[in-house]
Every structure is written in C-alpha cells, then in structure tokens.
A protein has these predicted regions:
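Active-site acidic/histidine proton-transfer and metal-coordination neighborhood
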Residues: 3-14, 69-77, 88-184
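Histidine-acidic metal/acid-base catalytic patches
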Residues: 3-6, 11-17, 33-35, 40, ...
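Mobile, glycine- and charge-enriched loop segments
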Residues: 12-29, 67, 71
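Hydrophobic faces of well-ordered beta-strands that scaffold small-molecule active sites
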Residues: 16-22, 47-49, 77-82, 117-119, ...
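Acidic-and-aromatic substrate-binding clefts and catalytic sites of carbohydrate-active enzymes
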Residues: 25-30, 50-62, 85-98, 125-129, ...
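Catalytic domains of carbohydrate-active enzymes, especially glycoside hydrolases
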Residues: 33-53, 108, 112-116
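Alpha-helix N-cap and loop-to-helix initiation/capping positions
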Residues: 34, 57-65, 93-101, 130-141, ...
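Alpha-helical scaffold elements within enzyme catalytic domains, especially in hydrolases
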Residues: 38-41, 65-69, 108-111, 145-149, ...
C-alpha cells in the first residue's frame, strides 16, 4: 500500500512587515485617512508617517482618530519628524528648540500608537563647509537631553541616514554615544549612495540598531566627473536590491520594510574634482572602493521625461510605488 502523501507544509511566516513610507505619496495631497485607505489596498502592514504634514496635525483628537482608523484596518502606525539638529541647515528653529519639538513628537507617538519617532540630522548640505562631526555632536547632546522623556514614554527615536548627511559609521557613532537603549536607526537603502557608500555596507554596519527602514532601488554608473546616481523602481537598479532585502529580512526580523518610492533623474558626484572631497574627508578608502565597484558595473540611465501636468505626475508617483510594492511582495513572499 502506498504511503499517504505528506501534508503540505505551511508557508513560513513573513520575517518582516511590509510598510509604506508616505513620502512615496508626497504629491497626492491626501488626508491621513485617504493615505491609510490607499495603503490598505496595497496590503501594507505598517504606514510610516515620516513627516508631520502627512498625519495632518498633532492635535490629540486627530491623532486618536488616525490611530483608530489604522487599527480598524489592521495597520501599524509609525510617526516621524524632520531635523532635530540645531546646527543643521534643515533645522526649523521657529518650531521651538530641538528638545521641545522631540517632546511634542513623543507625546504624539503615544497618542497615535507609534512605538518610535523617526527623525533626521540633516542633509548633504551639512557636510559643507562641515565638518559633519559638529552636527553629530549637536544631535547627540539633544538626544541625551530627551532620554528621560523617551524612556518615560517607553519609546525609541529612530535616526535616519538621510539625504547624504551621514555614512553608516557616523550614524553608528551617533547612536552609541546618544544611548542605544533609546536611540536606533531608520535604515534607508537609497541614501548611502549620496555619501559614496555601498548600501550593503550600511546594512552590515547598522543592522543591530535598526528600528525601522525605508527601501528603494538605485542605479549607479560612472561619468567623466565621477559617478551618477538615480533612484529607481524596485528591481530596476544595479545595487543588488534583492540580496539587500533578503539580508534585511534575515538580520532585522520583525521590523518594517517600508517602501520609500522616489524616482529621480541622475545626480552627479564629481569626485574627480579635489574640492569635492572637502565634504567627504572622512570617507575610508576601502569603503569608497566598494562604491566604485557598484558604479563600474552600472549602465547610464536617461533622464525621465517630465510629466505633462501635475495630475500626470501624481499618477506616475502612484504607479512607481505600486510597482515597487508588488515587486517586493513577490521577492519576499509577503
């Protein structure tokens, strides 16, 4: 008598939560409830309100309403803010001191049901005239000042490697010196290239500190001035994003892998000009060599044609995100 066929094994549970960073929908001008409805249609488990503008306001009743709406749809909320570094060119002093701004966000995160507050130091502009170390020190001081309040709220602050401000080793230093008991990383896969860094090195360095993430693909290639970088839809780049996502799922189980869809025209990094290096004097040669290996494998990408009108731009923005979400879901079996 033939043996009975074995029962089909249950599929393994997803090791990461598929999320959407609402910067992906920055041009839609939707309410937080419309953003949640759209995210639910894409089967997102986490919605990352990376800036205050996306959640509408920090009024307690609004935050409670958004929380209820998300919970009814089985969605986890993360909230965030922009610069918390008083010496950064991005910092908005009109909104109060950095400590006051973080304090408001910690209160808001509690009301909204977010386990973290995402924040940034600044951007690549803070590397000029530099040094970036002074801004790191400024941010560390602020974070130490809010440690007690963060711990009282049982919340953590996720600092992003943002817009070319810090390489992985610099963000690691910021986290360690601020206090890794309440500060971690919002790991972005596209921004490392704006600091001449291999995104895989960024992941290797920061994965022990990851609280949440932004993911998108990138295309990098050599140009006469140095290298060019474009952010692209998932699967269209040359940074081995499939391997990156699988590695993230292995190293950061249970964390959100949130799509931050941004499709850009090429940005040139003119590293053949000696003046360029005034902003990047601390970049290790061995790390830069890894970046060059990626660029050497790349092929030039033509600039994307501009949308014919704002509505066409909004439609393309949605199409870019939907394509990246679908690609990533299939890749990881989410």
């Amino acid at each position: 008598m033939a043996a009975a066929a074995p029962l089909a094994m249950a599929a393994p549970a997803p090791t990461v939560k598929l999320g959407i960073d609402l910067f992906s929908l920055r041009s839609q001008n939707w309410t937080p409830f419309q953003l949640l409805d759209y995210s639910a249609k894409l089967a997102a488990k986490v919605v990352h309100f990376s800036e205050i503008r996306f959640i509408g306001s920090l009024e307690p009743e609004n935050l409670r309403s958004v929380r209820r709406y998300a919970e009814e749809r089985g969605i986890e909320i993360e909230i965030g803010m922009r610069s918390i570094c008083p010496t950064s060119k991005m910092f908005d002093a009109k909104a109060g001191t950095a400590e006051e701004q973080i304090g408001r966000m910690l209160d808001s995160a509690t009301l909204a049901g977010s386990r973290i507050v995402r924040a940034v130091l600044g951007s690549s502009e803070d590397r000029r005239p530099g040094p970036i170390e002074k801004h790191i020190e400024s941010t560390i001081k602020v974070l130490r000042n809010v440690r007690a309040k963060a711990q009282d709220h049982n919340l953590k602050i996720a600092i992003e490697n943002h817009s070319g401000d810090m390489q992985a080793h610099e963000l690691k230093q910021l986290i360690e010196e601020s206090g890794k008991d309440f500060v971690g990383a919002c790991l972005d896969s596209g921004n490392p290239l704006w600091t001449l860094e291999d995104p895989h090195l960024t992941l290797e360095t920061l994965h022990p500190y990851v609280l949440t993430s932004h993911v998108r693909d990138s295309s990098v290639w050599r140009v006469p001035e140095g290298a060019a970088v474009s952010w692209v839809r998932m699967g269209q780049g040359n940074v081995a994003i499939d391997e990156y996502c699988r590695k993230y799922a292995e190293l950061c189980p249970g964390r959100a892998l949130s799509m931050e869809s941004i499709v850009t025209n090429p940005r040139v990094f003119a590293f053949r000009d000696p003046k360029f290096w005034e902003a990047y004097r601390d970049v290790p040669a061995w790390s830069f060599a890894r970046f060059l290996e990626i660029a050497d494998r790349g092929q030039p990408r033509a600039a994307e044609p501009r949308p014919a009108n704002p509505e066409a731009g909004r439609q393309r923005e949605r199409e870019d995100l939907e394509a990246s979400v679908e690609y990533t879901r299939k890749l990881l079996g989410l």
